[in-house]
Swiss-Prot record:
Entry-linked InterPro entries: Elp3/MiaA/NifB-like_rSAM, Methylthiotransferase, Methylthiotransferase_CS, Methylthiotransferase_N, Methylthiotransferase_N_sf, NA-bd_OB-fold, Ribosomal_uS12_MeSTrfase_RimO, rSAM
Organism, scientific name: Vibrio cholerae serotype O1 (strain ATCC 39315 / El Tor Inaba N16961)
Gene that encodes it: rimO
Known role: Catalyzes the methylthiolation of an aspartic acid residue of ribosomal protein uS12.
Residue ranges of every copy of the TRAM domain listed in the record: 401-467
Entry binding sites for [4Fe-4S] cluster 2: 175, 179, 182
MTTase N-terminal domain residues: 33-143
Binding residues for [4Fe-4S] cluster 1: 42, 78, 107
Cellular component, GO annotation: cytosol
Taxonomy of the source species: Bacteria, Pseudomonadati, Pseudomonadota, Gammaproteobacteria, Vibrionales
Cofactor(s) listed: [4Fe-4S] cluster
One MF term in the entry's GO annotations: protein methylthiotransferase activity
Protein name as annotated: Ribosomal protein uS12 methylthiotransferase RimO
Manner of cofactor binding, per the entry note: Binds 2 [4Fe-4S] clusters. One cluster is coordinated with 3 cysteines and an exchangeable S-adenosyl-L-methionine.
Metal-binding as UniProt keyword: yes
């Protein structure tokens, strides 16, 4: 969808508990080394889950899909906003009820007392990206197998929870910013960039495994390398600077889709746009602007030059006319006046962004914004949210109408008896729009096909394959 509210994503190795328990045989046997796993929250958390699962699999643990068969269940939590915290606590509770042996990790794990107050019987709790600590807890309650039948079965690119044709590529951990609505730095720490050679190596393994799209993620993607003072690294024996432009250039050599997410609007982002115009990376930029009122941006501790940003967007589009810009915004931030909100709407109409997510401000325990006076009533937040959505829906619908009659390359995500569903370069998985190909049942996920766009609504496209141009 183009306009959205926040709902924590859930990726799990487990089937729905009630269905699974009902179907289990009373004679099921456990061997002491079977692990169930639930991953909540953002793609960055998903990558952490993949790393943990890869290590567990390498050590010989079996990953299973039912609470009943699991010797231990790991829940990788999200703690970004209150709804995410509640989702995490509910999931921990479900795992305790259905299995009883639960290890908790992730962002909410940084607030152990809060978890223990609700669920005192969890076996162990660790914070985010504490991979080794998670493994130590697993070793304590589900000892490593003496015989490892899976060593040769773990793929070079590790265990992935995404479909085979796309993968998230995390380039750094933590964040140096101190936005007043966010507590991520207190949970994940300051920016730590991965070595460029390590990133390129992982990307190559993913490509060799059949991945057609890399989604580059971090807390602050455009800050990549700041902590190393943009030192010189090496990838495949060649020198490469630790900065987002150089990294993007290297990734762009692989001949697959490269999509940049969570890009903070630093001045040097301007240097990436020519790479998009040249086709080295997808002309898609995910920049969380958050607001447009200078007063609100100052309270958020975000960049406050909204007019300057409009000028940059205009320049970007001149350099790369196909550029798609996705962003997220917060309405109902403490102290936001009707005048501030109107500035946001006017800016949105001027910016004509392609994909937009909207969140009603939600207090986060420990966030500095909670101390700001003039907290906004819930009914006012809802009203502003709906008005914001209407404006962006009109913008999105008009933009997609212009796609009708054009031919676009589409990456197929899924196929069923009704047809295929895919995405264009303008659409990231899970958060953006889709392309529906009715009746096209002979395609496979991961295929790239040329599609003539025939219909559009506010968010999605419909079309037919251009068979003689594939």
């Amino acid at each position: 969808m183009t306009v959205q509210t926040f709902t924590p994503n859930q990726t799990t190795t487990l089937e729905t508990a009630k269905k699974t328990i009902a179907e289990q045989s009373q004679n099921s046997q456990t061997t002491g080394n079977k692990i169930g796993f639930v991953s909540l929250g953002c793609p960055k958390n998903l990558v952490d889950s993949e790393r943990i699962l890869t290590q567990l699999r390498t050590e010989g643990y079996e990953i299973v899909n039912s609470y009943h068969d699991s010797d231990v269940v790991i829940v990788n939590t999200c703690g970004f906003i209150d709804s995410a915290v509640q989702e995490s606590l509910d999931t921990i509770g479900e795992a305790l009820k259905e299995n009883g042996k639960v290890i908790v990790t992730g962002c909410l794990g940084a607030r152990e007392d809060e978890i223990r107050q609700v669920h005192p019987n969890v076996l162990g709790i660790t914070g985010p990206h504490a991979y080794q600590n998670v493994l130590e807890h697993v070793h304590q309650y589900a000892p490593k197998p003496a015989h490892n039948p899976f060593t040769s079965l773990v793929p070079d690119h590790g265990v992935k929870l995404t479909p085979k044709h796309y993968a998230y590529l995390k380039i750094s951990e933590g964040c140096n910013h101190r936005c007043t609505f966010c507590i991520i730095p207190s949970m994940r720490g300051d920016l730590v960039s991965r070595p460029v050679g390590e990133i390129i190596g992982e990307a190559e393994r993913l490509k060799n495994a059949g991945v057609k799209e890399l989604l580059v993620i971090s807390q602050d993607t455009s800050a990549y390398g700041v902590d190393t003072k943009h030192s010189l690294g090496f990838a495949n024996g060649s020198p490469v600077r630790h900065n987002i432009k150089a990294l993007s250039e290297e990734l762009g050599k692989m001949g697959i889709w490269v999509r940049l997410h969570y890009v903070y609007p630093y001045p040097h982002v301007d240097e990436i746009i020519p790479l998009m115009a040249e086709g080295k990376v997808l002309p898609y930029l995910d920049i969380p602007f958050q607001h447009a009122s200078p007063r609100v941006l100052k309270m958020m501790k975000r960049p406050g030059q909204a007019e300057r940003t409009l000028e940059r967007i205009k320049k970007w589009r001149e350099i790369c006319p196909e550029l798609v810009i996705r962003s997220t915004f917060i309405v109902g931030f403490p102290g936001e006046t009707e005048e501030d909100f109107q500035i946001l709407l006017d800016w949105l109409k001027e910016a004509q962004l392609d994909r937009v997510g909207c969140f009603k401000y939600s207090p986060v325990e420990g966030a500095a914004a909670n101390e700001i006076e003039d907290q906004i009533p819930e009914d006012v937040k809802q009203d502003r949210f709906e008005r914001f959505m209407l404006v962006q829906q009109e913008i999105s619908a008009a933009k997609l109408q212009k796609r009708i009659g054009s031919t676009m390359q589409v990456l197929i995500d899924e196929v069923d008896e009704e047809g295929a569903i895919g995405r264009t370069y303008a659409d990231a998985p899970e958060i953006d729009g889709l392309v529906y190909l009715n009746g096209e049942t002979n395609l496979k996920p991961g295929e790239l096909v040329n599609v003539v766009i025939e219909h559009a609504d506010e968010y999605d496209l419909w079309g037919s394959i251009l068979h003689d141009a594939q």
